[in-house]
From Swiss-Prot:
Transmembrane segments: none annotated. Residues 1-27, 205-247 are annotated as: Disordered. Residues 219-228 have a biased composition (Acidic residues). Residues 16-27, 229-247 have a biased composition (Basic and acidic residues). Dispensable for normal development and fertility. This is Uncharacterized protein C10orf120 homolog.
Length: 343
């Protein structure tokens, strides 16, 4: 439509110019000099018409819709009066869309537009109101926050469950002794340990070495200490059971909402085996119409006959030989029957 209006306006101007020229011609032809030479006379109306035609050619047709539209929207830089917009002209000047300079120019313009939009959003009160409404009405999701709720629960546990098992106590006591020995070696305070080893050497060790005796002494001491700990813990447990048989514990329990199971997307090529499967060769097995009929009497075409030969394990050359032998035998029998009639 715009191109039609652009093309239409100059036509109107040209038509007016033609009319003015025709009128000028008529005036020159109508008035002649005394010598019979035509004299050219200029009318004021002609000059006005020429001015109008020039103005109509120079400007975009003011009476047309395009002229009215451009008159009101000339201040907008995004609207181009010609064939290309300013941005398109700049891209063409840089060598087209596929050049590096044009791409850089487009990214710069995009970044400039993004910054301008951000500034307008910060200044806009309506945008802030919309953002606040979205924050209020958004539902809790996995990224925003936890899906579970906090509940306080009372759990009643008997004191027997808090007792340390014997094996764990032995490991702890051995570890404590090893740490004490290491500290003593570091600070060179080995007197209490040497006395303990001497006391253990007086005990019957049955011809063991010094290291084995030391280990036996340690094990015996550990056993004694463990027994003492057991007795002490039992006594303390009895006292606790007398005072408070059960103990209440308050703890925070989080009940998570059931999340939907994530669907595992599988590609159809994942189900295929790594090595290509061998295609089973086609073979005819069992009794069929082909196996019931004789090879020579088989009514099918050559391809089916060949397939029948392969299924039976017969090669075509052998089959042709068999048919020839049968034909020869049949011909001999016929000749033997015909021979007695001649005599």
């Amino acid at each position: 439509m715009i191109r039609e209006w652009e093309n239409g306006c100059p036509k109107i101007g040209k038509q007016r110019a033609r009319d003015s020229r025709a009128q000028e011609r008529m005036t020159t032809e109508g008035k002649l000099n005394k010598n019979g030479i035509p004299a050219r006379v200029f009318n004021i109306s002609d000059s006005f018409l020429n001015k109008e035609s020039l103005s109509s050619q120079g400007d975009v047709c003011p009476a047309s819709p395009l002229g009215i539209w451009t008159k009101f929207y000339k201040s907008d830089p995004r609207i181009a009066l010609g064939k290309y917009s300013p941005l398109e002209k700049e891209i063409l000047r840089l060598g087209g869309v596929h050049t590096v300079a044009a791409r850089r120019f487009l990214t710069y313009k995009q970044e400039e537009e993004r910054k301008m939009l951000k500034e307008l959003q910060t200044l806009s009160a309506d945008y802030k109101r919309v953002v606040d409404c979205r924050r209020q009405h958004t539902s809790p999701c996995a990224t925003c926050g936890s899906l579970g709720k906090m509940w306080t629960a009372k759990v009643i546990v008997s004191p027997e469950e808090f007792r340390m098992p014997r094996r764990e106590r032995l490991n702890v006591s051995k570890h404590i002794e090893r740490m004490q020995l290491a500290r003593a070696l570091r600070s060179k305070q080995l007197l209490p340990y040497i006395e303990r080893f001497r006391g253990s050497s007086l005990l019957p060790s049955g011809g063991l070495g010094p290291m084995a005796r030391a280990r036996a002494g340690e094990g015996q001491d550990d056993g004694n200490t463990d027994d003492g700990n057991d007795v002490h813990q039992k006594g303390r447990g009895e006292v606790e059971s007398k005072t408070s048989k059960r103990q209440e514990i308050k703890m925070n329990v989080i009940f998570k909402s059931e999340e939907p199971q994530k669907c595992i997307t599988s590609h159809p090529n994942d189900l295929k085996p790594f090595f290509p499967a061998k295609k089973a060769e086609r073979s005819i097995t069992g009794l069929t119409n082909r196996s019931l009929l004789h090879v020579s009497e088989f009514p099918g075409d050559l391809m089916l006959m060949n397939q029948d030969f392969l299924s039976r394990g017969i090669y075509p050359s052998y089959a042709s030989q068999a048919t020839r032998l049968e034909e020869e035998n049949a011909w001999k029998e016929y000749m033997c029957k015909v021979a007695p009639h001649h005599y």
